UniProtKB/Swiss-Prot annotation:
The lineage of its organism: Bacteria, Pseudomonadati, Chlorobiota, Chlorobiia, Chlorobiales. One of its GO terms (biological process) is chlorophyll biosynthetic process. It is an enzyme of class 1 (oxidoreductase). GO terms for molecular function: oxidoreductase activity. It comes from Chlorobaculum tepidum (strain ATCC 49652 / DSM 12025 / NBRC 103806 / TLS) (Chlorobium tepidum). Its EC number is 1.-.-.-. Belongs to the CrtC hydratase family. Keywords: Carotenoid biosynthesis, Chlorophyll biosynthesis, Oxidoreductase, Photosynthesis. Transmembrane segments: none annotated. This is Hydroxyneurosporene dehydrogenase. The keyword Ligase does not apply.
Length: 382
């Protein structure tokens, strides 16, 4: 796995090998309003049941047409309010829905676009989509302005025995974020307008084969605190008995010093699983020279057969000094279920494929929408 902070690597790589993928991830949180958002653009949608089914059928010679990443672009948006998911929109479609910024950094899927302005050192996001299955339309505009960046590179070409099939580009470890969300009911025209002012993060991932062919599992997380900003990234490579590839990045506000650690000892404990959630460690411990971090995964914000997103509690030692516990965001991924036809069937309940009818998608969103209405009514009562 390659790791880099090179800004030039943020542009679309135009990967065309069957099974290859690329995505651009932004998240932000406004603690004062209890709002957090996640935006992701995909080309070669790495979690698409349609893309991966096509890939497996082509690989098994049951289909002659090879799957091209550009035919499986997509966009997703999640909104969390007071720790509860209120919108989870995922749509994918053909190459006619996707475009990239010519000569620059930025992509578009339908009416959803991000672009990087190097003169202002700013990422501008504009969102415009309808979500009929949940009776919503969403328009939004957001600005991500980096507060600092790291300078780090790990190139597998220079390390014997390490196979490059995935690259992580840490674009913006911390950003000042301003935004406006306009959410409208399609049936009643009721509107909710949310002002956003908070902190955010942006990275970029890409790979040359489906994730389940190269990655066994990974953990990622971040926290912003008064003492430090911290990001960790841990990948257990498939078929590799060696220690996981791990990096820990720290900005110490007390000293102003940035540190990157890639000799990190990793231990997992308190393993658990859910009905449709993969086996994972609820406690993750990371130790490097002069730094140790223990991550306790707490409330699940989003769950699936291969993915979990949590609020987390981090305990840290910097040197000999114990830090106060801080809250963060953590994720876990086990891509193996992505290959399962059964799990692809269930995953299709969350993914709207343009031009494709899915009974699972209709039923899932019907019951989810009904549940949300009951929840809103009960909140008003109490």
């Amino acid at each position: 796995m390659n790791i880099t902070t090179d800004s030039l690597q943020q542009a679309w790589h135009r990967l065309d090998a069957p099974g290859s993928y690329e995505w651009w991830y932004f998240d932000a949180e406004d603690e004062s309003e209890g709002i957090s958002v996640v935006f992701i653009w995909f080309v070669g949608f790495a979690f698409s049941p349609y893309y991966l089914s096509h890939y497996e059928e082509w690989k098994a010679h049951r289909r002659d047409d090879q799957p091209y990443p550009l035919d499986y672009g997509g966009f997703s948006f999640q909104l969390y309010q007071d720790g509860r998911e209120t919108i989870n929109f995922i749509k994918e479609g053909g190459r006619e829905l996707f475009a990239s910024e010519d000569g620059g950094i930025g992509v578009r899927f339908e009416g959803n676009r991000f672009v990087y302005d190097p003169l202002r050192d700013e990422y501008r996001l504009s969102i415009d989509f309808s979500f009929p299955a949940r009776d919503r339309s969403v328009q939004a505009s957001f600005s991500f302005r980096p507060l600092h960046r790291f300078d780090y590179h790990f190139d597998t070409d220079l390390h014997a025995g390490v196979d490059f099939r995935h690259q992580w580009v840490l674009s913006v470890p911390k950003a000042e974020v301003h935004g406006l969300l306009d959410i409208t009911s399609l049936s009643s025209d009721k509107r909710q307008v949310l002002q956003f002012r908070g902190r955010g993060y942006h990275d970029h991932n890409l790979g040359t084969v489906p994730m389940y062919e190269s990655i066994d599992r990974w953990y990622w997380g971040r926290t912003f605190s008064r003492r430090c900003d911290l990001i960790y990234y841990v990948v257990f490579l498939r078929g590799c008995s060696a220690e996981p590839q791990a990096v820990l990045m720290l900005l110490d506000h007390k000293t102003g010093r940035q540190s990157t650690f890639d000799a990190v000892r990793v231990s997992e404990s308190r393993f658990t699983r859910g009905l449709f959630a993969p086996v994972h460690g609820k406690t993750l411990r990371l130790e490097a020279e002069g730094v140790s971090v223990e991550v306790q995964h707490q409330k699940a914000l989003d769950t699936g057969p291969f993915y979990l997103r949590y609020t987390s509690l981090l305990s840290m030692m910097i040197g000999e000094e114990a830090q106060e516990e801080v809250r963060g965001i953590s994720e876990f991924l086990n891509p193996a279920p992505l290959k399962s036809r059964l799990m692809q069937f269930f995953t299709a309940s969350r993914v709207w494929r343009a031009g494709k009818q899915s009974a699972m998608y209709v039923l899932y969103n019907f019951f989810k929408h009904r549940f949300e209405r009951v929840h809103r009514i009960n909140r008003k009562k109490f």
